[in-house]
Amino acid sequence: MPRGQKSKLRAREKRRQARAKNAQEKEASPGPFYGCPHQASPVASMPTSPNMPMGEQSTFSHSYTSTSDQNLDEKSSDDSEDTEDWCKDPINHKVVLLVQFLMEKYQKKEVITKADMLKYVIKTSKNHFNEILKRASEHMELAFGIDLKEVDPNRHCYALFNKLEHTFDGVMGEEKMPSSGLLMIVLGVIFMNDNCVSETEIWNVLSMMGVYANRKHFIYGDPKKVITEDMVQLKYLEYQQVPNSNPPSFEFTWGPRACAEISKMKILEFWAKIHDTTPDSFPTLYEAALKDEEERAQARAVARAHTAAMASPYSRATVCSSSHTNI
């Protein structure tokens, strides 16, 4: 074979090998959006509150204690390593990719189909599709308060729904994923701390989930702004300076809108589900949630009675007016 032809064949073979290598890397590595984010730690790592009764605290999968800044840095480093190890598992990695894929579809208001999930995310892991989808759905529900539901079984089309009765799209804008999950976590921490918690403790808890005050989050955007400004303006949270604190420190309580729209039982059910248990596994918190349910029922009864009392004179006046007209 002529030397020139051999050179062409060698060059062609090198190009073929390079293309094959690039294809393998593309399959193994996610695109710029579907990377394994630092924040995508397992939902099971969500911590308990330091002020939760000890008997109840031990029921949760991971205990939590207040730490110094140095310990927080060490904890952040450990969590980062745990996250990397967790993401190295092929199935876990696909779960993270699918969660991000679903969120991008949500933001673009595009139809979610099984075919697209298989084509763009699952790829060679088709045999594990059901497991990956189930775990991704659980992650979105527990971490973000979002339900994934199949809305067209024939075409295998899915849609995302906010678990709360009232959506929180206004918190981050219509183009972002609702942050109801973040709100429920913050409300839960407040509930577990006798209905008032320091800002420091809130960030200690959220940092264990990969949510930091000074770091952009791939779902929540600017978490500090969402919690200390947006949710406060929407009256889901109250954020105020601790009296006589020097340097100034701040604390959170439930806002009037949260008190009106979200029951403590709903929050406790949310946290219990995170830790794969039931609300009555935490007797003290469960008792407080039951008391809240009773107070809500009484308030509704009083409101109904008041409405009926206001309507009664109007009804009598209407009857009298009709009688005079007939005469």
From Swiss-Prot:
Disulfide bonds: none annotated. It comes from the Eukaryota. Residues 1-19 have a biased composition (Basic residues). Its main location: cytoplasm. Keywords: Cytoplasm, Tumor antigen, Ubl conjugation pathway. It is found in: Cytoplasm. GO terms for cellular component: cytoplasm. Residues 1-85 are annotated as: Disordered. Expressed in testis, stomach, large intestine, small intestine, spleen, lymph node, bone marrow lymphocytes and blood T-lymphocytes. Not detected in brain, heart, lung, liver or kidney (at protein level). Residues 46-70 have a biased composition (Polar residues). Residues 91-289 form the MAGE domain. Interacts with LNX1. PANTHER family: MELANOMA-ASSOCIATED ANTIGEN B18 (PTHR11736:SF23), MELANOMA-ASSOCIATED ANTIGEN MAGE ANTIGEN (PTHR11736). May enhance ubiquitin ligase activity of RING-type zinc finger-containing E3 ubiquitin-protein ligases. Proposed to act through recruitment and/or stabilization of the Ubl-conjugating enzyme (E2) at the E3:substrate complex. This is Melanoma-associated antigen B18. It comes from Mus musculus (Mouse). The gene is Mageb18.
